[in-house]
Amino acid sequence: MTTSPLHTRFGGIAELRAALAGRQVSARELARSALDAAQAAGDLNTFLHIDPDLTLAQADAADAALAAGTAGPLAGVPIAHKDAFVTRGWRTTAGSKMLEGYASPFDATVVQRLQAAGAVSLGKLNCDEFAMGSANENSAYGPVRNPWDPNAVPGGSSGGSAAAVAARLVAAATGTDTGGSVRQPAALCGVSGIKPTYGTVSRYGIVAFGSSLDQAGPLAPSSRDLLELLDPMSGFDPQDATSLETCDGAPNAPGRIRAAYDAAQAACDAAGSQPLKGLRIGVPQEYFGAGLAPDVAAAVEAALAQFEALGAQRVAVSLPRTELAIPAYYVIAPAEASSNLARYDGVRYGHRAAEYADLNQMIARSRAEGFGDEVKRRILIGTYVLSHGYYDAYYLQAQRVRRLIAQDFQRAYAGQCDVIMGPVAPTVAKNIGDNRDDPTADWLADVYTLGVSLAGLPAMSIPAGFGNGGRPVGLQIIGNYFDEGRLLAIADRYQQVTDWHRRVPGQQGTEQ
């Protein structure tokens, strides 16, 4: 990337907000600079849809609100949205030819809320087709390249979001996490990302993959930046049947996560030189087995040692069904995907084949032409496990395993530990094309993230150093239900004494 966007001169989102409020820079200047940077970084293939007129109109509205004293907390902050969120104005494809050219008549709730907070969108970010993938190689519009090494994958499915943040094209981005699709690309691109508790952020307007698993979450350089997006994103939404009205007795509303974050930070301040004194970090033995690469293990161990230096206590815990999360997830998620994607038939919307003899052939050809190989693979698996004679043997059994996995986490939290930490992925980013002939290799790489998703727990990834080839390593921090605020505060304490989150591709050691 040859152009450094203007927003990188001001630090994080809080500092950028102060600069905008103090008229040191305008929202239009930030937007114009970010648009230029995105164009200059076209080789990364992070953006699918950019409309400068729409972006600059939002920036002008932010400037007007700042001048009038009515600006929201994100007024003028340049962000971008994963192409799994429907947006009015920008096309929504979910990385698929099936939705090529689709124009949504409405915005997803997450998009609405961030726009109401004043954020300025640069457009839509590349992702694996229908969010199915761990490398962002399944997009119908080409793979995203990792800013740390253009030969490497960025992770998926929110690879465009992670790469755009790593390259500092935007101050933050939205993503979705079904089985690790925020955490894993955040780890492989050296940025921070969080998947909140299932039901705390609206799914309305997210192109559905696995409805009992999908959850929206932000990606940004730091934990503090994540807070600035996650808090206004969250809250009950009557348009989402899975949205929670309360979180452990407290209203599910903007302000909940920030209040918990502030309380956790106050407790850290009161603890003095060891701000995390009393925090019990559970380290699952199953996360450090033979499948974990030595370079990743070393980086994670160093991060854990840093947390101990901050006063935390490391305790051994067991999550005995960690490996069972893989087959359970790859039964449940494809089953839900096959149901959700049944609506794409070439009749109501989506790709329609140009030539067909009858209705059945039209539907068959439209789906064959519109869906990519990985999506077809998961539809076939899902249809099979839901079919008569196999439902009990596969889908019902997978749901039972899912319940047992959730119980494993609760046993760990019931008296043993406060948070769980470990790796996000077993290796650093692979090269593009490495797993082309073995698609299940990407599935196995999700071993540390899938259980969290099946249990519906909050978890985040933060930068924790570099492994082989100078490729980033992420540390996963897993909390109990509704612990987002505390997770963000714990991560911030680590980031106050380390600088991994400030490292920028090509500019190591510099901040944003």
UniProtKB/Swiss-Prot annotation:
Transmembrane segments: none
Catalyzed chemical reaction(s): L-glutamyl-tRNA(Gln) + L-glutamine + ATP + H2O = L-glutaminyl-tRNA(Gln) + L-glutamate + ADP + phosphate + H(+)
Key word Iron present: no
Enzyme class: ligase
Gene Ontology terms: biological process: translation
One function term, GO molecular function aspect: glutaminyl-tRNA synthase (glutamine-hydrolyzing) activity
Sorted UniProt keywords: ATP-binding, Ligase, Nucleotide-binding, Protein biosynthesis
Catalytic residues as annotated in Swiss-Prot or TrEMBL: K82 (charge relay system), S157 (charge relay system), S181 (acyl-ester intermediate)
GO cellular component: glutamyl-tRNA(Gln) amidotransferase complex
EC number: 6.3.5.7
Pfam families xrefs: Amidase
Record has ATP-binding as a keyword: yes
Subunit structure of this chain's protein: Heterotrimer of A, B and C subunits.
Annotated PANTHER family: GLUTAMYL-TRNA(GLN) AMIDOTRANSFERASE SUBUNIT A (PTHR11895:SF151), TRANSAMIDASE (PTHR11895)
Family: Belongs to the amidase family. GatA subfamily.
Database matches in HAMAP family: GatA (MF_00120)
Role summary: Allows the formation of correctly charged Gln-tRNA(Gln) through the transamidation of misacylated Glu-tRNA(Gln) in organisms which lack glutaminyl-tRNA synthetase. The reaction takes place in the presence of glutamine and ATP through an activated gamma-phospho-Glu-tRNA(Gln).
Cited NCBIfam families: gatA
Name used for this protein in its record: Glutamyl-tRNA(Gln) amidotransferase subunit A
